[in-house]
A protein has these predicted regions:
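Short cysteine-rich clusters marking metal-coordination/redox-active sites
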Residues: 65-68, 99-100
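Short basic-aromatic helix/loop recognition motifs at nucleic-acid
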Residues: 129-135, 374-375, 379
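Short, charged amphipathic recognition helices of the HTH superfamily
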Residues: 133-145, 332-333
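Catalytic or ion-translocation cores adjacent to nucleophile or general acid/base/metal-coordination motifs
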Residues: 119-123, 223, 270-271, 275-282
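Acidic/histidine-rich catalytic cores and adjacent linkers
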Residues: 2-45, 49, 60-61, 67, ...
């Protein structure tokens, strides 16, 4: 269906001069308030007229919604409808046809556009609102959209749209991941005295890295234990294979105990390892200077670097030297644990004993497979900083479900943009079925105005 649409705009400018800003402002005002929405509405009415005419003439049949064996349609009435979109409020009068045989009525344009029964907004507006509120609070988002984009959406309406959307759903795969990261951060949730729930909420996130190096978000959870999270992560696959080859964590006990069994190996984050030793020695009443010296000693022991060359180019002697360095580092760790025990630092010693089991998984994996594994959990830490920057500022008093949903939206947008855009391409049905071409913009001779 092709149509040539003519748009007439009357422009009147002062001969004494005007500012460029006023011209741009008035142009934007005209098209945002009237032009664009009216343009969309006109195209819809033209399509509606064409479809209904062909159905009444019997040239096309409503096969997917046929009411009887040989339906014949006649015009029944017109219904006013309006849709909220990013270009403004689109107002149309669509036709309702009635079958002369059985009396059933249909709205061809609604079926043609595949709209829901009581749909009052476009999906592209929902996408815009969701992306804006993932950056700032609902109140600020509402003001921002009206001020910058002239899109009035109340904060309660935006909240309802996001809560009802399934855009936070994450893709699943049976492929074994290369790496698994997990971490948590606190936020002030909505308290509930009846259920004995305080305002100290915790948001926990699991991320994976696949064999190609792409980040795969696995989920965001609030009010869930690490055991429940492990069950959810493990349930994403239907196979008995490990979820990931290597877990990289900060050593939190619940996380380590429940997620390490889902992976082939476990690597403790070296940065957290050194930092947390200071805290455990403080619990043992060690002095500040001694704590700092012990931290430096631990950092020197575990600072074993992987050769920069490709695995195939590293000679056997260098590989043997790396293996000997790991064995020597493990002996030094045992000596350090003995020193801590001799000084009565029981908490710090137990901390290193537990951590020593997974200190050098990255080196052993490289020696076995040639795959380089990070020694720190900086990737998940960066993601948690982004989440904390948003949620701790705007999620005050949120429910646990609301905070988890927004976290899934954020990690999907920022760690797997491909998933996010794929979802919305399918949802918006962008399939090159509409083409608009601006042929020309020209002015009429002023002498013909008013004729």
């Amino acid at each position: 269906m092709q149509n040539i649409i003519t748009m007439q705009v009357l422009s009147a400018t002062s001969e004494k001069g005007f500012s460029l800003d006023e011209l741009v402002f008035r142009t934007k005002e005209l098209f945002e308030k009237e032009g664009l929405a009216s343009f969309v509405g006109l195209i819809l009415e033209l399509v509606d007229e064409r479809i209904c005419l062909k159905m009444v003439q019997g040239k096309i049949q409503d096969g997917s919604h046929a009411c009887c064996l040989s339906p014949e349609y006649a015009h029944h009435d017109l219904t006013d409808r309006q849709f909220r979109t990013s270009v403004g409020k689109v107002i149309i009068r669509w036709r309702r046809l009635k079958c002369t045989g059985c009396g059933k009525t249909v709205i061809p344009l609604r079926q043609f556009l595949d709209l829901e029964l009581y749909q009052s907004k476009s999906s592209e507006l929902e996408k815009l609102v969701t992306e804006v509120v993932s950056e700032q609070s609902y109140r600020r988002s509402s003001s921002h959209m009206e001020l910058i984009g002239s899109i009035p959406v109340a904060k309660s309406t935006a909240h309802r749209w996001v809560a009802q959307s399934d855009c936070d759903k994450l893709d699943s795969s049976d492929e074994t991941l290369d790496l698994l990261f997990a971490d948590g951060t606190g936020y002030k949730r909505r308290p509930d005295d009846d259920r004995d729930i305080n305002n100290r909420g915790e948001l926990r996130v699991a991320l994976g890295v696949d064999k190609s190096g792409s980040i795969a978000p696995l989920g965001a959870f609030s009010g869930k234990s690490w055991k429940e999270i492990a069950c959810a992560v493990n349930g994403r696959t239907d196979t008995d294979e490990p979820v990931a080859d290597m877990l990289i964590s900060d050593g939190e006990r619940g996380l380590e105990q429940n997620l390490s069994v889902l992976c082939g190996d476990h690597q403790r984050c070296h940065w957290h390892l050194v930092r947390d030793l200071n805290y455990t020695m403080w619990q043992d009443t060690a002095g500040k200077l001694e704590r700092k010296e012990t931290q430096k000693e631990l950092a020197a022991i575990i600072g074993i670097e992987i050769p920069e060359e490709d695995f195939e180019q590293v000679c056997d002697d260098d590989k043997d030297a790396l293996e000997d360095a790991v064995a020597g580092a493990e002996r030094d760790i045992r000596k350090l644990i003995g020193k801590l025990l001799d000084k009565g630092y029981q908490t710090a010693a137990e901390y290193l004993i537990r951590a020593s089991k997974n200190m050098f998984g990255y080196a052993r994996r490289w020696l076995k497979t040639g795959i380089v594994t990070p020694r720190v959990s900086s990737m998940i830490e960066r993601m948690m900083r982004e989440l904390a920057r948003r949620l701790k500022r705007m999620a005050f008093g949120w429910s646990e479900d609301g905070a988890a949903k927004m976290a899934r939206i954020i990690i999907k947008r920022f760690t797997s943009a491909g998933q996010w855009e794929k979802y919305w391409r399918e949802r918006l049905r962008i399939q090159n079925n509409v083409m608009l071409v601006l042929r020309n913009i020209k002015a009429e001779n002023p002498q013909t105005l008013g004729q």
